[in-house]
Amino acid sequence: DPSLYGRMDFAWCGNAPVKLLEYNADTPTSLYESAYFQWLWLEDARRSGIIPRDADQYNAIQERLISRFSELYSREPFYFCCCQDTDEDRSTVLYLQDCAQQAGQESRFIYIEDLGLGVGGVLTDLDDNVIQRAFKLYPLEWMMRDDNGPLLRKRREQWVEPLWKSILSNKGLMPLLWRFFPGHPNLLASWFEGEKSQIAAGESYVRKPIYSREGGNVTIFDGQNNVVDHADGDYADEPMIYQAFQPLPRFGDSYTLIGSWIVDDEACGMG
């Protein structure tokens, strides 16, 4: 099943190898800012003289998204959906819908809450049209746990992102990568809850739910196992992983994280 996009998050201090923090393979946001507004900033900064006029930016995200939607072309309408009362998600979905339209796709928007079930379990819109394919900015694990989750196994419609992305978006991927490639310079030591720690005594570490969004329920511990920082959220009941703590570089009052964007299987920009 085809995929659309994802974002790998890296920490880099400038004098040591870049470290992979996690892979947002299912519902990455900040796409609109990275693909569109970041490019507007570049053009404004050139004009104002903040940066040289020949300065460039590694950013082909929008072009690659449009190209990818062209590759996924079908005469069937492409539905785009997210939850109600989620302004950031709505903006991201509208942006992706616009990219699809630029690629020649017929697109329609519908809220997740308005999706219906027709005869035989087919997915329908508010006009009872059968939905054949849809992009959803809605976590796959939530879909699987919904009352109608078992219908996903019957695969009557094509979802973007596809079901296999639920594996890559699971932060359990990080301990597995460390197990397969121990000591890799671009990985952080990681382990599952209940396993032996993969860092030396006295080193700081992080606890993360295997599924979470925007840092929800992430906890930072110092080398004496004291909580240094904690983010509340809705994911406290998820299984946890542990990961060596990697501080982000600080510039003034800001901490910088590299979001490396991937469209299909091709890196195409940072933001």
Task: State where each predicted segment sits.
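Conserved metal-phosphate-binding beta-hairpin within the catalytic cores
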Residues: D1-T27, I258-W261
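Domain-scale recognition of functional cores that engage charged ligands
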Residues: C13-N15, S30-E33, Q38-G271
